[in-house]
Amino acid sequence: MDGIRYAVFTDKSIQLLGKNQYTSNVESGSTRTEIKHWVELFFGVKVIAMNSHRLRGKARRMGPIMGQTMHYRRMIITLQPGYSIPPLRKKRT
């Protein structure tokens, strides 16, 4: 899985599953067309819409040094009725 890092399971994303919308974090350098092409090819589904937004990394401190985690992009993928994506693995914390 080149573009998709992991599926997102929040209260909102679980609600969106009822509307045939799937939420996942993807690599920040990926474009919408790359992700759409990859999802259609890998899962054999038809994508009708994609929404994306970039999320800033969180601030982290290691002793006196301030740093931050990497920025990332989140995609909400809407599929045509009748198609579904099997559950993706959850990120380990």
From Swiss-Prot:
Similarity section? Belongs to the universal ribosomal protein uL23 family.
Tell me where it resides: Plastid, Chloroplast
Record PROSITE patterns: RIBOSOMAL_L23 (PS00050)
- Outline the subunit composition: Part of the 50S ribosomal subunit.
Which organism encodes this protein?
Lactuca sativa
Task: Tell me which domain of life the UniProt entry assigns to the organism this sequence originates from.
Answer: Eukaryota
What GO MF terms are annotated?
A: mRNA binding; rRNA binding; structural constituent of ribosome
GO CC annotation, single: ribosome
Cross-referenced HAMAP family, in alphabetical order? Ribosomal_uL23_B
Task: Provide this UniProt record's keywords sorted from A to Z.
Answer: Chloroplast, Plastid, Ribonucleoprotein, Ribosomal protein, RNA-binding, rRNA-binding
Signal peptide annotation: none
List the InterPro entries hit by this protein, alphabetically: Nucleotide-bd_a/b_plait_sf (IPR012677), Ribosomal_uL23-like (IPR013025), Ribosomal_uL23/eL15/eS24_sf (IPR012678), Ribosomal_uL23_CS (IPR001014)
Transmembrane segment boundaries: none
A Gene Ontology biological process noted in the UniProt record is: translation
Chief place of localization: plastid
* Biological function: Binds to 23S rRNA.
Indicate what this protein is called per its UniProt record: Large ribosomal subunit protein uL23cz/uL23cy
In the UniProt record, does the keyword Nuclease occur? no
Q: Does the keyword Ribonucleoprotein apply?
A: yes
- Specify the taxonomic lineage: Eukaryota, Viridiplantae, Streptophyta, Embryophyta, Tracheophyta
